[in-house]
Amino acid sequence: MALDILIVDDEQDIRDLVSGVLDDEGYGTRTAASADEALAALDERLPSLILLDVWLRGSSMDGIELLRAIKLRDPQIPVIVFSGHGNIDTAVAAIGHG
């Protein structure tokens, strides 16, 4: 069975690109444009892996806050946090939350 990967990013182009590449490699993907959509996807089915953008513009919480919420639901879900606008403080915060 293929890994189920949840891609969380506010930019449609990024979601489409990452999802397309992973789908072509045989992975199952779902996407979410906001923290609320991501949490709803978790309620539906826990993924094998989450790819999470740090900056979720227009969302009820940013990526670090969403990471905390994800880890409260299931601390075992692996999460890869990414951003085109990161800095050391953001990286330290992400590592600190799992």
Regions found by a protein language model. Give the residues of each.
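His-Asp phosphorelay/catalytic-motif detector in bacterial-type signaling
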Residues: 2, 46-48, 72-78
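Two-component/phosphorelay signaling modules centered on CheY-like receiver
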Residues: 3, 11-30
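Acidic, metal-coordinating helix/loop segments flanking the phosphotransfer/catalytic sites
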Residues: 6, 31-49, 57
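The short loop immediately C-terminal to the conserved phospho-acceptor aspartate in CheY-like receiver
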Residues: 11, 55-57, 78
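Short amphipathic alpha-helix used as the core "switch/output" element in two-component signaling
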Residues: 40, 62-76, 93
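Short, conserved "switch-loop" micro-motifs in signal-transduction and mechanochemical regulators
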Residues: 73, 85-86, 97
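Receiver (REC) domain alpha4 helix and immediately following alpha4-beta5 loop
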Residues: 88-92
